[in-house]
Structure formats: C-alpha cells, structure tokens
C-alpha cells in the first residue's frame, strides 16, 4: 500500500497586495479573521512582485503572466524590454552576432541597412532607445547607408507625441554624418494584427518601393503635414522622407532589414510579407530578397534570423518535481488556469510527468462584480479533496477573485471577494494541517488593496506595484527572511520539502528551518 503524501501546497491569491493605508483598500475593509490570525501568529514576510525584481522595468506594476513565470522559475525572468535594456547598458547588444552579422554582410556588399520599428517610448511593443542603439551599432560597424523607417505610435503614448522622437533621430543622423529617417507611417498600417492586408500593403509599398501618399524633406515636416491633415501619430499616412538630391531608400536585394519591435503580435503580418515565399495577403508589387532580422522570435514558423531567440527555462519547479519523481497538481478557475499551468511551467504547454490538472469553470457573468465569490467554493472543495487524497507531493492553486473583481473597480464587490477568500483559506489551512502538510499563501501582484486612484479620484482598476504577503502554515519551526521576491518561492518550497535546489534557480529560501 502506498504511503499517503503530505503535500506542500502553494495558494496564490491573485491580486492580493499589501498596503498600509486603509482608505479605498478592499483587503483592509473586508472582514478577514482567518488571514488576520495567520498574519499575527504564523511566520510571514512581504515580498516584491513588481519592477526589476520580476524582470520588468523599474517600478512597473506586476502582472499575472510575469508573476507566475517568476514563481515557477525560481529565478528572475527578464522580460524582453528589460533584457534588451540590460544588454544595451552592458554593451552586449553591440556585439550581438546576428545584428552585427547582418550589418557586416550588407556593408561588405555595398548594400543598405534598413531599420524599422515602432518609434516610441511606450515600451509595450518596442522602445526608441533600442532603435537608437541599433542605429549606433550600424554606424559603429561601418555601414554608410542607414535608413530608418519609423512606425509612429499614439496608442501606448499620447496621440501626438512623435515629434520629439523624430527630432532626436534626425539630430543623431546629422551628428553621425550618415543615415537618415527614410519614411514615416502610423502603426495602424504597419502593425495590423487582424489580417487587414490593405493596411499592411501601404506600409510594405512605402518600405520596398519608397512610394507613399505623401513626401516631405524631413521627418518632422512630414509629421507636421500629417497633423495638418488631422492625422494623429497612429494614423499618419505613408510618407516618403527625401530631400532634393538624396538617393531614395527603396529596398534592394541584399539589403539588411532589421525589425526592432520585441513584441510579436503586431510584428508578424508585415514580417510575413517580407519573409514568406508563399505569401498571399496581397499581391506584392516588388519582392525583395533582404537579409531580414527579427529582434525576437515573432512566430516559430517564420523562418528568418532572430537576434534574441526565446530563452528556454531549464529546471523550473514543475520540471524539477518531475525529474525527482514527485507528483503535483495544478488547479484554478478558467481565468487563471493558464497561469498555474503554462506560465508557471515557464511557457511549456504540456504537463510534466506526474502532473495532474483540474480546471474549474469561472462563472458566466458579464463582469465579476456581479458574482465576486466567483467559483471559489467549488475550487476549495476540489482543492481540499486533493490535499486529503494523499496523492500529491505538491499542489499549486490560484484563486482569481482579488484580481478579477479588483479590475471592475467596484469597492463593495472587491470586499465581498476578499471575504469569500478568507473562508476558502480557512478550509485549505485546516485540510493541510489535518494531513501534516505545509502551506504557503502568497500573491502574484497587487490590485484589490487599491480601489481608487488618489490622483484622479476615479476607480483604480489596474494592478499595483506594492508588495504581497507570504505566510507559512505547517509544523516546521521556521524563521522568515526579509527582502524576498516572487522568484524566491520555488526555492522556498523545495527547501521546506527537504529537496535539493537546482543550480538554475538563483532565488533564496525565505523560511529557514530552525
């Protein structure tokens, strides 16, 4: 007969941040006798769930995807934006073999280096600092013909904010004594993601043929003309930038084309127009055989060079459990099921050996303020049964309420959501203690603790950059360590289970057994 297992349970209360101020704080306002007692009587600490500590830009609020990747990886996982910032800062970017190789090949053949991307400080799809670094790389590596094709933002930035960015690049090219802005067009055309190929075609023709609806001597003049036509940045029509006497920047076979967007979804369509031999989105007037480089991998089936391939995570918590012949369960509602499976496993879709999954359907309501408890009762029932089954070495569970109801901005509903969670935590803690298991309670980021924006007085529906609680429930005598972050959770669990921590995990245990 197999011995009943005493599980190590991780409960993630999504959107359950820690904030001292009581005003507009749904977590403070709710009646939470169970969490209050655990915080008062059990080993606990606060951990960081935002900004650089989770691989995001400094002070940027956390999110569920990033949070769960860090929780499962046991190391800080840098997001593309931050990864590139770090690479540029330490100059590794300038030695990137794919980028440098494309520039050298074009330069040695007397060809042009074309750089395209969303010229924006928004940091969502791209960052203009990365594009500036690419211009510098091309110049440093001896390229003479450097053409920048600027896609204008106005969605992740104010609607008319491109002028300062374009000025900066025109000044840079003047200082270098070579290169220029060769075209401008709104992201509405160049970055479609809904197969509106008539839009993409306008951007493609602008790039390949150096033909557009409008022409201007300078990028700033072209932008000002667009504003005079009542076009905001996002909708600027295809504009060729070419002063008298300048050669046109039409693309030729053998040119290098480097796409500086790091986010994939709005980069795929125009990339396929250049790369796919069997492309049929529109009839291309000119097919050019360029040396196309994607900054990151936009899709696995796009066969062209990638400067920064996806970093595969080795020995995440789930993989390490499987390698050590441990059994594990992942359980949540629909809203956060992908987070405790795909994201917690470091972007791996398939379950590991010994990994079971339970999906509880989230309620079918228009918005979750209408049913703030969501499906927490059913989720708790299934979770408690799994804890008592003796089948699992470890269980990962996410309760979505704090986040999903927090997003509605309805304070009364968020309070009810938090109160429902308190009852759930009580049941789970009792079950864990009844079988001699261990329980960690934490969150992936904040939300419900800030329900009103103090600056505007409007409902606050976004995540926060505040810390989140971490509580230990179990029979071990442990001491909490301060200064932790989400990537310390997996090593903490392994340490409490008496298991070796793989060397890839750089996080540190936050509860030390005394």
Swiss-Prot record:
Identify the residues that bind substrate. Answer: 125, 155-156, 187, 193, 263-266, 336
Per UniProt, the keywords (alphabetical) are: Glycolysis, Isomerase, Manganese, Metal-binding
Task: Write out the catalytic residues in the record.
Answer: 64
Got any disulfides in this one, which pairs? none
Q: Which GO terms describe its biological process?
A: glucose catabolic process; glycolytic process
EC no. given is 5.4.2.12
Q: Name one GO cellular component term.
A: cytosol
Q: What does this protein do?
A: Catalyzes the interconversion of 2-phosphoglycerate and 3-phosphoglycerate.
- Kindly give the PANTHER family that the UniProt entry links to this protein: 2,3-BISPHOSPHOGLYCERATE-INDEPENDENT PHOSPHOGLYCERATE MUTASE (PTHR31637:SF0)
Task: Write down what this protein is called.
Answer: 2,3-bisphosphoglycerate-independent phosphoglycerate mutase
